[in-house]
Amino acid sequence: MNTGSPGHDAIHNEIKYYAVLGHDRSISDPSGLARRTFTAEGRLDESLRRDLTWVRSSEIYQWERGENFGPELVEISAGEAEALMERFRQKWAQ
């Protein structure tokens, strides 16, 4: 619901990106990408699939709560996420 206050839409369209660091991976060579979008309806957490589409995921939520005993997540910028998606696009196209 838009209250008409300045910045309201910006808050609800914020996206945070996370590099997924699997076993023996680093921030320079992550194994995946996740994002959290803040919408008027609430948070939407997703992970990038090999076909470069986004699918709902509980990975960020579990990681925040300490329930994820798998990959580590590291917050990255939108620019870094774009560059990472391009790297995955090239890598997964092979």
Q: What are these regions, as identified by a protein language model?
A:
Residues 1-6, 90-94:
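Short intrinsically disordered terminal tails
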Residues 5, 17, 39-41:
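Serine/threonine-rich, low-complexity intrinsically disordered segments
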Residues 13-14, 34, 57, 84:
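A general marker of short, structured functional hotspots
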Residues 42-94:
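Short, mixed-charge low-complexity intrinsically disordered segments
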